[in-house]
From Swiss-Prot:
GO terms for cellular component: nucleolus; nucleoplasm; small-subunit processome. It is an enzyme of class 2 (transferase). Specifically dimethylates two adjacent adenosines in the loop of a conserved hairpin near the 3'-end of 18S rRNA in the 40S particle. Involved in the pre-rRNA processing steps leading to small-subunit rRNA production independently of its RNA-modifying catalytic activity. Part of the small subunit (SSU) processome, first precursor of the small eukaryotic ribosomal subunit. Its EC number is 2.1.1.183. S-adenosyl-L-methionine binds at residues 36, 38, 63, 84, 112, 127. The gene is dimt1. It comes from the Eukaryota. Belongs to the class I-like SAM-binding methyltransferase superfamily. rRNA adenine N(6)-methyltransferase family. Keywords: Methyltransferase, Nucleus, RNA-binding, rRNA processing, S-adenosyl-L-methionine, Transferase. It catalyses: adenosine(1779)/adenosine(1780) in 18S rRNA + 4 S-adenosyl-L-methionine = N(6)-dimethyladenosine(1779)/N(6)-dimethyladenosine(1780) in 18S rRNA + 4 S-adenosyl-L-homocysteine + 4 H(+). It is found in: Nucleus, Nucleoplasm; Nucleus, Nucleolus. It holds the Pfam family RrnaAD. HAMAP family: 16SrRNA_methyltr_A. It comes from Dictyostelium discoideum (Social amoeba). This is Probable dimethyladenosine transferase.
Amino acid sequence: MVKPVKIGVDAKVEKTKSATAARHHEFQMNKSYGQHLLKNPLIIDAIVDKSQLKSTDTVLEIGPGTGNLTMKLLENCKKVIAIEVDPRMAAELQKRVAASPYAQHLQIILGDFLKVDLPYFDVCVANVPYQISSPLTFKLLAHRPIFRTAVLMFQKEFALRLGAKPGDSLYCRLSVNTQLLSKVTHLMKVGKNNFLPPPKVESAVVRIEPFNPPPPINFVEWDGLVKLCFSRKNKTLSGIFRVSSVIETLNQNYKTYCALEGKMNTDGSDEQMKELIIKTLTDNDFLDSRSSKLDINDFLKLLNKFHETGIHFK
């Protein structure tokens, strides 16, 4: 077994790379888990530095692999809780840390991040398996109590979508939903050759800082509106909301809302609903707006105006 090496530069860097390669060749990477071990100690140092850890922090790491990032985290915080789905990786990490001074400061949870109950943590740091990027992000943002910050490695395009602004080509439902709940900062690009094995795409690291307290909004309602608006983001809202299936769904929601509120007007036609929708869009200057150009405040205003007329999205 190769003992963990304290990350440094020059000869120490090469020694660490050799250790990583040795661990990599002990077993085959599992493609279904999206396993790509981060091997460059300089990138690891930068990620830990940008995490702004405190000595009292509990850090959640997702997909620690053989522990290259884990070891550096353990040097800078009180405790690391590592969630690993691959038993081989978990065993390798356990062996590696057992030979270090940090054995009592690591907790390994064997399981699928998307299925396990998350413990308390202050900071999340992860080289994210790219195929679970979106559900992972929103599971983190839904976690309570709210954590301080997350520094996450994603596929480059996904990272750019997270931070995209109105008018950007990558601006989408993901951008709007993430930025409703958090501040997103792009930290650095990471080339594919910094991993074993190299992924097919470039990567990037972002910082996500959840708003605390979170916005007082029903997220299911919000996402229902945003999902509809971005179904064709370059089409006008007038065009999107005139689609017969959309009108039919919103009319059914409206009737349910009226029934629950004890209101009598539960027999309105789809044509009446269409008129109500168009009036709401027109009165609030949204008729010719396009989702690709609307910011968070625009969507908040639009949702509030729809709610004022009894139009709901769930």
